[in-house]
């Protein structure tokens, strides 16, 4: 199993032990936040004093297992490094903590991405509702996407579940 941990978290022994045994602990502990193609769970890490959110990506199909094992970075690795890059560019995103890759017979089995838990909300419920998007929210979203583009970021998976926001007052969205 490959475990890559952000330098800021390497001294947290509880977290390191947890991540190194993630393949067995993931299903036994934590609180489910989302369960669909991928699973997202929240885990209390006492030593950190806060929760860590871990996304477990679905098991790749046979051909994908070969591709992710030898030719392409895993989704978890890309999420980790993309998150670090966003922070470096001043774009608010949950702090990446680690990624874990689990292989079987040398081929990718599962991969996990860990980040700090945030109080920001998913944009998805607002997009899926039957009424038009609030004008202030729509403008804030447009400004955010322009900011991403200006900084050289092309969001390749632009869906509401991948965009987090928080509201500051009645009309200020971030």
Regions found by a protein language model. Give the residues of each.
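Conserved ATP-binding subdomain of kinase catalytic cores across diverse folds
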Residues: 17-122, 146, 150-151, 155
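N-terminal presequences and immediately downstream first alpha-helices
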Residues: 1-21, 28
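Catalytic activation segment of kinase domains across protein kinase-like and atypical kinase folds
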Residues: 161-174
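Conserved alphaE helix
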Residues: 136-144
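AlphaC helix of the protein kinase catalytic domain
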Residues: 122-132
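Hydrophobic HxD+1 residue recognition
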Residues: 158
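Alpha-helix N-cap and loop-to-helix initiation/capping positions
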Residues: 71-74, 132-136
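A broadly conserved detector of short glycine/acidic/proline-rich loop/turn motifs that flank catalytic sites
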Residues: 9, 58, 169
